[in-house]
């Protein structure tokens, strides 16, 4: 009996040693590795460069030289596109733990190439040689981004004719129109084959959008009449400062308004009224500060990854309340534009976008305003959202989603972007007109 006990202890010790010494699975499975990643020099800012991660199409339906290329830009200002990569629409993402990458069922690179760029310089893994090199306005943002993208295309000559679609969310509601406007107006015959612009829950015309918060939350039942008046007064302060061209003060006033709104509603996050906790973007920070992640992406181990750069945000502070609506108007006359919003977002949601849309100086606005708003259902017959489209403009309201639409509705967001790029289903094809006025243009 004593010998059996001794043998059992020895075997247990050996098994324990084997289990301790067994290699851990890699943080990044082979399938999760980017096709390419690294740095793109930015002109005219010597020593500065933009970090990128590129994922080729998984199931392309055309030869790769003809396969659409989506360029994703995060908002902020000052937030990294690696949030979009590893938390929203990339092929693998973190869901519950920073050490566990899970396959994304709604990855946007199923049919298309997908390029994430840390924009502008100084954001995420991108490098700004000095603070003076960080852009202070959208013109400079566009110049840097264009230079980086041209470098990317030159490094990959077979990509030079690929149709390019710029996409992004939140403050990229400025970046996306800015790069589109720059290419269409100043580089129409350049190396970027621009085919469309897509903005999710964007901040594009801030002075109009900031005036929608009070009425939006009031009719949602989140504040009472007295609180609505208080919010309206806070909105008016920001608007007045814009009219006086006190741009930094206007941005500060907007921040105070959003803080007031958050305190009044008591929500975990204004980005999604249904969430009990904020979005877990912190998981991406934990992921990308691990040594293996930096090695895989080709980043120096000494670089500390931050979700958003306070320095970049401060440099662009005076830009926050400036409108780029005119850039969207210019683009609509020349290329496809998709505006989509998660319906649970209180910051940059449906009402916020619809208000500035109806003020656009665009030749197709009249026809768009009478176009049918159609019900979009997913494969199971569940309502996924609502689509209104005419000419070059497609507007989509996504049910069950907040600010981060691809996070909340992965497969639906993928179906939307694929349908829009390929011109299929509700997102493409013939224009649909109705004889009665659209509900889009109600007065608030």
Swiss-Prot record:
Keywords from the named record: Carboxypeptidase, Disulfide bond, Glycoprotein, Hydrolase, Protease, Secreted, Signal
Signal peptide from the UniProt entry: 1-22
Glycosylation sites: 263, 361
Localisation per UniProt entry: Secreted
EC code(s) of this entry: 3.4.16.-
SUPFAM superfamilies: alpha/beta-Hydrolases
InterPro entries noted in UniProt: AB_hydrolase_fold, Peptidase_S10, Ser_caboxypep_his_AS
Single GO term (MF): serine-type carboxypeptidase activity
Keyword Protease (UniProt): yes
Active site, renumbered: 170, 345, 403
Tissue expression pattern: Ubiquitous.
GO CC list: extracellular region; plant-type vacuole
GO biological processes: proteolysis
Disulfide bonds: 79-308
PANTHER family attached to this UniProt entry: SERINE CARBOXYPEPTIDASE-LIKE 50, SERINE PROTEASE FAMILY S10 SERINE CARBOXYPEPTIDASE
General function of this protein: Probable carboxypeptidase.
Family, as annotated: Belongs to the peptidase S10 family.
Protein known as: Serine carboxypeptidase-like 50
Gene: SCPL50
